[in-house]
UniProtKB/Swiss-Prot annotation:
The keyword RNA-binding does not apply. The gene is carA. Belongs to the CarA family. It is an enzyme of class 6 (ligase). It comes from Buchnera aphidicola subsp. Baizongia pistaciae (strain Bp). Pathway: Amino-acid biosynthesis; L-arginine biosynthesis; carbamoyl phosphate from bicarbonate: step 1/1; Pyrimidine metabolism; UMP biosynthesis via de novo pathway; (S)-dihydroorotate from bicarbonate: step 1/3. This is Carbamoyl phosphate synthase small chain. It catalyses: hydrogencarbonate + L-glutamine + 2 ATP + H2O = carbamoyl phosphate + L-glutamate + 2 ADP + phosphate + 2 H(+). SUPFAM superfamilies: Carbamoyl phosphate synthetase, small subunit N-terminal domain, Class I glutamine amidotransferase-like. The keyword Lipoprotein does not apply.
């Protein structure tokens, strides 16, 4: 295939970034004109900008890429993790007007314009990252308009950065109705149907969509799972009517403590001991349902190079991370065992209920983008469902 370099013409317009602490950056706008507010976080990934931008977990946030050149390989239709960009805005040092890759179908510039995303470029992202690392994540404001009063801007930022005004972000990104995701799985929906080719049981997994990424669903279907994806506020009673083999609690945005409806359902599932696997927000929700506490981190974990240690085997895996909240290590309930910790800050990365078929992981084992080290956790979930299923069969016999 002929290697082609494609260049997009850009019309540069001045843009301004204002942080909650009063710091001001002046740069150029390469997205749509307008203004946006959001919590500013930084992501240290060098690749995978398309997957990051389309991750629903970034809802209500403004993403800062620490890597200086973004957009070099363009955009393709297959690597989006959701249908739209949920982030409120984007901050970069430079968006390349030249893109080249055999899979690319359009430029990042055009994609951002089509998605109506406000972007500021040509600012010192290293300086911004150092500020966020020191002060913690801050609310901020990006505008292409002339600012007449910084004081009024800061007042509005302070209003938005108030827990009382924060909305339930999960319900904004969750599906509104049940749907089936059955890629690569036998089309028949029956818990006792086996895949004729693989001679294995098809596992019916109910996925709670708190902001689920497409590749998570693919990882499960690749392991012979038939998926029913459901709204975040679905009751346990409705779920149990469709006879799942296991429950998957997905990633998602915001503070898990606002998802009381999910906690009610998880507690019901724990009571009957159905297999549960939670990641990211789902990990935090399982911890809350088990009696643990959640705290907000200073600037969170956002990147694809985070080392995590598995305590049982003493091995290290490099993982993809995207979260601003973590499970509090103080006063953990006795029914929870810590399975993984971060080698960056010692925070909890994995939990296992010692009295139930339930476990969770703070990172993103689907690795989109990121390393594949933690994909084995999906296999662990399959083994857990097999164990539960075999136990039920023995009871019936």
């Amino acid at each position: 295939m002929k290697h082609v370099l494609r260049k997009e013409k850009t019309l540069e317009i001045s843009a301004t970034l204002v942080l909650k602490d009063g710091t001001i950056f002046y740069g150029k706008s390469v997205g749509i004109q307008g203004e946006t507010y959001g919590e500013i976080v930084f992501n240290t990934s060098m690749t995978g900008y398309q997957e990051i931008l389309t991750d629903p977990s970034y809802s209500n946030q403004i993403i800062t890429f620490t890597y200086p050149h973004i957009g070099n390989v363009g955009i393709n239709k297959n690597d989006c993790e959701s249908n739209v960009i949920h982030a409120k805005g984007l901050i970069v040092r430079d968006i390349s007007s030249i893109y080249s890759n055999h899979r690319s179908q359009m430029s990042l510039l055009n994609y951002l314009l089509n998605q109506k995303i406000i972007v500021i470029s040509n600012i010192d992202t290293r300086k911004l990252t150092r500020i966020l690392r020191t002060t913690g994540s801050q609310y901020g404001y990006i505008t292409t308009k002339k600012i007449h009063s910084i004081i009024n801007v800061l007042k509005h930022i302070n209003i938005l950065d108030n827990p009382i005004t924060n909305k339930d972000l999960v319900k904004q990104v969750s599906t509104k109705k049940f749907y089936i995701w059955k890629k690569n799985v036998n089309k028949q929906k029956n818990n006792n149907i086996t895949n004729a080719k693989l001679k294995e049981k098809i596992w019916h997994v109910v996925v709670y969509d708190f902001g689920v990424k497409k590749n998570i669903l693919n990882m499960l279907t690749h392991r012979n799972c038939y998926l029913t994806v459901i709204p975040a506020d679905t009751s346990a009673e409705k779920v149990l009517q469709i006879l799942p083999d296991g429950i998957f609690l997905s990633n998602g945005p915001g503070d898990p403590r606002s998802c009381t409806y999910a906690l009610n359902a998880i507690n019901a599932f724990l009571k009957i001991n159905i297999p549960i696997f939670g990641i990211c927000l789902g990990h935090q929700l399982l911890a809350l349902a088990s009696g643990a506490k959640i705290i907000k981190m200073k600037f969170g974990h956002h990147g694809s190079n985070h080392p995590v240690k598995e305590l049982k085997s003493n091995t290290v895996m490099i993982t993809s991370q995207n979260h601003n909240y973590t499970v509090d290590t103080n006063n953990l309930p006795k029914n929870i065992n810590i399975t993984h910790i971060s080698l960056f800050d010692g925070s909890i990365q994995g939990l296992q209920r010692n009295d139930k078929h339930a476990f969770s992981f703070q990172g993103h084992p689907e690795a989109s983008p990121g390393p594949h080290d933690s994909m084995i956790l999906f296999d662990k979930f399959i083994k857990l469902m097999k164990k539960s299923y075999n136990s039920q069969q023995k009871t019936i016999i």
